[in-house]
Structure formats: C-alpha cells, structure tokens
Amino acid sequence: MAAPIAEELAKKQQAISVAEFFEKNRQILGFDSAPRSLITTVKEAVDNSLDACEEAEILPDILLHIERVGKDNVSVIVEDNGPGIVKEQIPKVFAKLLYGSRFHALKQSRGQQGIGISASVLYAQLTAGHPTSVISKIGPDSPAHHYEVMINTSTNDPEILLDEVIDWDRPHGTRVELEMEASYVKGRRQSIYEYLKATAIVNPHARLTLIEPDGNEVIFDRATDKLPIPAKEILPHPHGIELGTLMKMLRYTDRQKLAPFLRYSFSKIGLLTAEEICKAAGLDTEMLPSKLTRDQTKKLLDAFKKVKIMAPPTDCLSPIGEELIYKGLEKEFNVDFIATTTRSPSVFSGNPFVVEVGIAYGGVLQKDDRIDIMRFANRVPLLYQQGGCATTHAVEGIKWKQYGLNQPGGGMPTGPVVLLVHVASTNVPFTSESKDAIADIPEIRDEVELAIKEVSRKLNRYLNRQVSLKKRREKEIIITKVLPKMAQKLADTLERDLPDINPVVAKVMGNLLVMRHVEHGANGDAAVTIKVKNFGSKLTEFKLHDMLPYEISDVSPEPKVISMGSDFDYVWTMKVSPEGSKAVTYSLSSMSEDEIKRLPQLIVEGLDEELVTGAKAIKGLI
C-alpha cells in the first residue's frame, strides 16, 4: 500500500537557519541594489563604531576607505579608535546573525537586533566569495587579533579561516575589511558622502574621514569635544507589554510573590502601585507568579490600564540637544538662519521617545526646489523610503503658507530650506527590517508635527523681519541720497562746513546712532568719546567693539580686552533704552593727525545693519 501523501510531504519538511533565510531574502535588509548595498554596509559598520566609542566614553575617530576591485566589486575598510572586541567574541560579532548585546536592553542605541554587520559579511561572501577580515585590539598592552571569517548559512555559525596575532599600531580599536559586489556613486542624495555628512550633523562629537575610490580625502571634523550623555538601561513599562510577553515573564521569573514580581520587573511600579494593580485585577499579592492562568494574566494586563502608572523614565534616551543640532547644521550648511528645538519626552506603547527638529534657511540653498528633509532615528540617517515615513507625512500635513513657504498642490513645500528631524527612542518603530522609515504611530507623528511647527514659527518671524528690514533699507537708501544733496546746498548757501548727516538719518530711521569724537591735545594725546544714542522704540542690547593697534588708558567704563596679535579688541556690552544714550571715554597717547584719521570703524555686534547708523553692524551672538 502506498504511503499517505502526508508522510511523503513530511520527509521534505525541515528547519532553516536565519542565515539561510536572509541568504535568499537579502533585499529585506537593504541589499537590493549595488549602490544601496554599499551604503547599508558602511552604515552598519559606522553605527557599530559610534556605539562602541560612546559606550567606552571615547571621542569617535572613524576612517572609511573605499576602493574599486575589478569591474563590479569594491573593497570597504572601516577602522575606528573604539575599545576593541575581546578575542572570543570577534567571530560571533561578525559572522553570526542575531548575535549582539543590545536586543534585550531597553535604552537608546543605533543597532539593536544583532543583524547589521553580520548581514554585510553574508552579502560579501555571497557576491564576492571572499571572507571578511577583522583586526581588533582592546588595549595598548594587549595583542591585536586578526581573523578571516565567513558565515555557515546552514547553522548560522562562524567559519574561521584565519586566526592570528599581528602587530598593529593602534592602541585600541577595530578594523573590518569586506569585498563585495557594489558600486560607489557621487552627486546624489543616496550616496556615501551624503550619508557621512548627515551622520556628522547629528553626531557632532565624531570625526569621520572618507577616502574615495579616486583617492580624494574628505574629512568631516567634530564640532564639539563633548560626548553625548550616555543612555541608561531601564525596565519595561507596563503600558508596552502584550499578553504573551507577560505570560512568559510570569512563567520564568525567580520571584515567589506577585507584588515583588511587579515591583522589580517593570519601571515606575513601587510597592503601593503593585498592591493597587493586584487589587484591581482581583489577585492576591502573595500568590506565586508562575501559577497565574491565562485569564488571571489577562486581568493583570487590564489592571495596568486601570491603575494610574507614571510615564517611563527618560534617562534611557540621549537626545542631541538644540545647541549641538545648531552647530551641526552651521558646520555643514552655509545658510542665513537656523532654529532648533528638542521636545519634552513622550511615550507610545510604553516606549519613551523624544523628537528634535532643526530648520536651516537661505544662503546657498536652492530657492525653487522642494525642501530638503533629513530624517534620523537614534542618530542614524534614514536615506531611503522617504515617502513611507511618518516624518514625511507630518511635513506634508502642515499648511506651510502660514510659515512663509510655498506649497504647490498641498504636498511638499518648496524653498531654500533644510529640515532636520530626529526621533530617539528605546524602540523606534520602523516599517521594515531595513530600518529606512518610521511607522505612522500617532503619538510620534503628532510630536514631529508640533516640533516642526515650533521651528517654523521662528522661521516665519525671521522672514517677516527680513521684509521689514528690506523696507527700512529702501527707505534709508532714499534718505541717504537726498539728505547729502540738501546738506551740501545748505552749506554752500550759508558758507559753512558740510554737517554730519548721520544723526538726522538715525533719527528719521529710528536707528542706533554711534559716533566717535576725538579731541587732539597739543602734546599729541587724544581724548576719545564714543556716544551711542537709541532712536528706536525698543530696548537695544549689543556689544560695541573698538579694534585698535594701541593700548588705551583712562577708560570708562572698563571694557573686556581681547588681544589679537599686535592689535586689541576693546568690547563693551551695552543696553540702551528707547531715546536713551550712553558714552565711552578713553585716552590715546602720542597720536598724530594721520593716526587719528585712520582710526578703524566701530563695530556693533548683535544688530542688523539696517538698524545701525555710524558703525559697522554684524549679527553675531550676544
């Protein structure tokens, strides 16, 4: 009698390893084209280096060297100054999928699943047939270990082809070299250069060096020597737990009583809250957690929603901060205006998250193009699937006309704008394993929208101010053309010297007037008086600079003195009320008439040039 068909089918059924699955489905992880495969590999390696350096409190110094090998392949070398990897862990870190230290850690980090760099090793061996070379050293007195590894896709275990100790001049760090089928592209948004530029903006403490295939070297230098505040690991929050997960936790806990289990397994549950939860669920605080039935566990889960539990702690997050986002944008873009914000932390499904936004306007940015959106998750640039990201949806949902930007068709606005959006969380909800786009979680989208609107209001105030200043500028141009002619005619008629028209211009325009008066004594000494009068309607704050190649004496009030080689910058910080005035006096010794005539122009820092008469104005920072 023939065997039943079910028995024949059973003979063909077998388990597959995760490595085999991704071997046949590598596009899921971002290896679906030659350019993207290279970006994915670089991204995973750089993420690992940044995470390792920050955990060891080392300012990251990362080298990326890319070379073409033959017609279709490239060699990728990523070298860092991190803490290194202990010998026994090197093969597993690079040649075993789903092996890592962060999957169960509830804190903000770039990598989490333990797939990234090992997926690149798998792609390299599939397309180029070569092992991956790894060198790592954990200290100046420790040896450098050199491995060549591949992945056994049948078992998802590392295959070690070479294991040796070598001389390496670095005191500590890791170097990984892979050859793969990929292509290096330039001049487009999705490129290695743009990825590193974006990474440098949100990681201003890192120094990134790129050596391109043609030998060109690009350095993205650090903008700060201050390391990010390290994120702390937290316990899971009750609002983010699902039924099956709670059942598993109850089954395998070492706690003998339900109340202590709740207290020490979840964040923000103290003794009183644990007792309140048990009461709401109708459960005894003394009962053995592992004995709870499915129905009892469901009641416990429902009680989490009934009892008021504080939001999870936010020290598990490490936001960039408004100041460093500003510095990052300022370093990489030549623009006229920058505004930044870091929102207060929020929560979705028990996961804390924070949204940060920066907006840059003007300068050399293209006026007629769509705005440039730079998306980030846990300090990592998101270069692909922009249309499917919650960030993009939030941008498209805003009415940009009220903020001074055009929005043809009601979609993406146009204008000379770079918009940076960073979402940091213990669990960023990506739409796929390739981690290219953030899912449309209502809480996240709302926070992104609020943050964008906050910086956009600042941009709108700036744009309105520019319109006002333009009108003032046009008015002043007319006045400064007409008044000199009137003054000259009057002087000729009365046979007098041509008067200084600056006080008249300042009064008509409502400007800050700055005047220097010098009395030259017979002995060559000069008494200098600088008068400042505010003809405006608001309190004016600024810094007055007098940059001289001389030392001054008998000065009042005392300035801050900055030595500049053979010159001195004398700086007074001033506040002048409407219609108010202030004066600075000092003496200069042994001055000739020519030297007095050559005294440099005074500088006002902190005001627009349209608001100042009689001195050079620089915007600066007060």
Swiss-Prot record:
Residues binding ATP: N48, D80, S101, R102, G111, Q112, Q113, G114, I115, G116, I117, S118, K435
Q: Which Pfam families match?
A: HATPase_c, Top6b_C, Topo-VIb_trans
GO biological process: what's one of them? Answer: DNA topological change
Which catalytic reaction applies to this protein?
A: ATP-dependent breakage, passage and rejoining of double-stranded DNA
InterPro entries in alphabetical order:
HATPase_C_sf, Ribosomal_Su5_D2-typ_SF, Ribosomal_uS13-like_H2TH, Ribsml_uS5_D2-typ_fold_subgr, Top6b_C, TopoVI_B, TopoVI_B_transducer
Query: Gene3D superfamilies annotated for this entry?
Result: 1.10.8.50, 2.60.40.2960, 3.30.230.10, 6.10.20.80, Histidine kinase-like ATPase, C-terminal domain (3.30.565.10)
Q: How does it assemble?
A: Homodimer. Heterotetramer of two Top6A and two Top6B chains.
Name of the protein described by the UniProt record: Type 2 DNA topoisomerase 6 subunit B
